[in-house]
């Protein structure tokens, strides 16, 4: 708003205790500047994974909206989820879904005339050092998660502990980040659904209904499901022990569709962060404070 002091031919004023009148008038130029500023501050953030794409529109006050789209439905984004989405000024993302997914995503962004910036891993960024044998070959989603985890850890602890960063999707990646922000290495194991599907497809007598987690499973369905969860948890706890002799000091950050299922059965401290990759993408793109 623009404040005018004094008289105006069309102003409806009333006396004030200061001897002059204040009249609030909308400034077209100010309104235009506000609209432009809002546009410039909107960033569309993309995490294209193996099975689904997570995305979010980030504004100056945080996330405006968040969404998840199966990879098979990316081609309909502009007609559905993104149909009424405000135009972003910028799009940044990571893509491990392959070239075909990249082409489909870019086609959906064409309606806004926005070309996405695809990010990859590097030797160093945002306080994190990448010790992969060939740093650029580390999955971009894993790199973004490591950056986000380090930012969270340093924001809450003066002396941040070592941490294990887990993305539990189609595959489960388990990455070790030491107290100096150095990524030491990581594991890739089949995800829960992949383990269950593999048993069902390759073992003739194990086509059973979905099971539940039990401390001592007494039926085949529960034995299969509990075994898959325990396999993932065992790999995570082993990585904790490798990075610190006292695994109770190692924080675990979990993201991905199966994160809540796995997190329930891990020793604390555990933090499930739904949009860990998106946070890391924003940090790498220089959009987070």
Regions found by a protein language model. Name each.
Residues 77-90, 153, 239-250:
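Phosphate/pyrophosphate-binding loops at sites that engage ATP/ADP/AMP, CoA/4′-phosphopantetheine
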Residues 92-98, 168-170, 250-259:
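Glycine-rich beta-strand-to-loop/alpha-helix junction loops that act as flexible
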Residues 145-157, 184-225, 230, 284-288:
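Glycine-rich phosphate-binding loop plus the immediately following alpha-helix
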Residues 40, 126-163, 280-289:
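Conserved phosphate-binding catalytic cores of ATP/NTP-utilizing and phosphoryl-transfer enzymes
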Residues 114-126, 267-282:
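Conserved phosphate-binding/catalytic loops in two-lobed NTP-binding clefts
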Residues 3, 18, 25-26, 30-125:
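N-terminal glycine/serine-rich phosphate-binding loop of ATP-dependent small-molecule kinases
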Residues 67, 213-251, 258-261, 269-270:
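Adenine-nucleotide phosphate-binding core of ATP-dependent small-molecule kinases
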Residues 40-63, 149, 159-183, 199, ...:
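Gly/Thr-rich phosphate-binding beta-strand-loop-beta motif of the actin/hexokinase/Hsp70
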């Amino acid at each position: 708003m623009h404040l005018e002091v004094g008289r105006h031919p069309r102003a409806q004023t009333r006396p004030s205790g200061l001897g002059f009148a204040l009249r609030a008038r909308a400034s077209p130029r100010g309104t235009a500047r506000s609209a432009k500023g809002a546009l410039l501050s909107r960033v569309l953030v993309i995490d294209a994974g193996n099975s689904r794409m997570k995305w979010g529109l980030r504004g100056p006050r945080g996330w405006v909206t968040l969404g998840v789209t199966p990879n098979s439905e990316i081609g309909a984004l502009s007609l559905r989820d993104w149909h009424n989405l405000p135009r972003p000024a910028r799009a940044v993302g990571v893509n491990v879904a392959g070239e075909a997914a990249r082409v489909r995503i870019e086609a959906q962004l064409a309606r806004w005339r926005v070309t996405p910036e695809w990010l990859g891993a590097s030797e160093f960024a945002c306080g994190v050092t990448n010790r992969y044998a060939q740093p650029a070959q580390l999955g971009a989603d894993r790199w973004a998660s490591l950056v986000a985890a380090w930012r969270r850890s340093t924001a809450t602890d003066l002396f941040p502990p070592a941490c294990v960063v887990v993305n539990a999707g189609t595959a489960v990646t388990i990455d070790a980040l030491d107290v100096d922000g150095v990524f030491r290495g990581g594991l890739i194991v089949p995800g829960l659904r992949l383990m269950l599907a593999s048993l069902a497809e390759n073992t003739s007598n194990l086509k059973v209904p979905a099971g539940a987690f039990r401390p001592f499973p007494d039926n085949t369905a529960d034995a299969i499901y509990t075994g898959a969860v325990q396999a993932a948890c065992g790999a995570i706890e082993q990585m904790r022990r490798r990075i610190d002799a006292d695994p109770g000091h190692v924080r675990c950050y979990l993201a991905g569709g199966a994160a809540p299922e796995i997190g329930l059965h891990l020793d604390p401290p555990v933090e499930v962060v739904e949009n860990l990759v998106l946070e890391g993408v924003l940090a790498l793109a220089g959009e987070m404070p």
